[in-house]
């Protein structure tokens, strides 16, 4: 029994002298209290995300007592505070990102005692991490099946992102692949429509891919968007595998962790890599005071097992500064127990003139996706694709783009149009 007449017990979850055990999961939060002390606010986070309710209870089971989260670090940070909380693994189901996020990123975001709350990072111990497979291929595996050893992979999306018939899409794909693009990608909302059915597109595009591979001697792939209800995604993945595809693309945020974990199993059986699009992430990653960081999102996606994921560019049109993106990319490429490294994808407002700076900032282990910066070339998509490849080759070789453009009319026209513009 809890022999106390006190109503609230949030401070029972705060112990700044506590030393976390090696098998506890650590979560870092930024928060701003609303009418309560920082200690109480931190305790409320720990309580709500572990075993708590708003009041003291008549009885606590022994397991509940041992499962209480503990705030062990609390420091002022700007207008708010940083808290680090240790969670016993008894709180978490093995191998379930869904259950983990329901705890550490669930009801805590709705508490009135907090003006803002942001999940900055989480640190799973090996005892928890070992239940996750991570990527099936990762950077090394993708480089092997693509046959690309020492340069960034190139990707593009036919623009406009919607409105293409299957025949029109196939014609554009032929031009893009022939010009030097490695990966043709559907955009996030391009799935299956009366004017372009998935089943027709998948068959047509892989026939075009096979033709281009025979003509160029290069491996080409199609990041086809299979996103939909889980049963539909599974059927679409099977179609891709039957047509000889190597990749599927999933909008992982809108699909959700449960769907992604299921499709990780499906794609392993089918031998398919997962390209993770992050559409909708900014709804909770963009506000620096509230939500979940892109870093935490990328970490969770790596645990489940995506092979490549969009992270930003720092030089293009999408929000995200260099330090944030570099931190994410470095983590995705780092050694992490048995979990393979993941290819970061740079996309959004890229064109050939930005390649030297992009590669200088983030290195060669990168998928570079340029949509408008390829499709908007004055001489068409094939020329745009070649201009991008030539710009990347120049950057890898340490050549000035203006010098490279002397032997590449496609690159010269791209530079004449966009120069070194950074879109806003």
UniProtKB/Swiss-Prot annotation:
Keywords: Carbon dioxide fixation, Lyase, Magnesium, Metal-binding, Oxidoreductase. GO terms for molecular function: magnesium ion binding; oxidoreductase activity; ribulose-bisphosphate carboxylase activity. The active site is at 159 (proton acceptor), 277 (proton acceptor). Its EC number is 4.1.1.39. InterPro entries: RuBisCO, RuBisCO_III, RuBisCO_lsu_C, RuBisCO_lsu_C_sf, RuBisCO_lsu_fd_N, RuBisCO_lsu_N_sf. Signal peptide: none annotated. The modification N6-carboxylysine is found at residue 185. Mg(2+) binds at residues 185, 187-188. It holds the Pfam family RuBisCO_large. It catalyses: 2 (2R)-3-phosphoglycerate + 2 H(+) = D-ribulose 1,5-bisphosphate + CO2 + H2O; D-ribulose 1,5-bisphosphate + O2 = 2-phosphoglycolate + (2R)-3-phosphoglycerate + 2 H(+). Binds 1 Mg(2+) ion per subunit. One of its GO terms (biological process) is AMP catabolic process. The record marks 317 as: Transition state stabilizer. The keyword Lyase applies. Its cofactor is Mg(2+). Substrate binds at residues 161, 278, 310, 347-349, 369-372. Homodimer or homodecamer. In contrast to form I RuBisCO, the form III RuBisCO is composed solely of large subunits. Because the Archaea possessing a type III RuBisCO are all anaerobic, it is most likely that only the carboxylase activity of RuBisCO, and not the competitive oxygenase activity (by which RuBP reacts with O(2) to form one molecule of 3-phosphoglycerate and one molecule of 2-phosphoglycolate), is biologically relevant in these strains. Belongs to the RuBisCO large chain family. Type III subfamily. Catalyzes the addition of molecular CO(2) and H(2)O to ribulose 1,5-bisphosphate (RuBP), generating two molecules of 3-phosphoglycerate (3-PGA). Functions in an archaeal AMP degradation pathway, together with AMP phosphorylase and R15P isomerase. NCBIfam families: PRK04208.1, rubisco_III. HAMAP family: RuBisCO_L_type3 (MF_01133). This is Ribulose bisphosphate carboxylase. It comes from Pyrococcus abyssi (strain GE5 / Orsay).
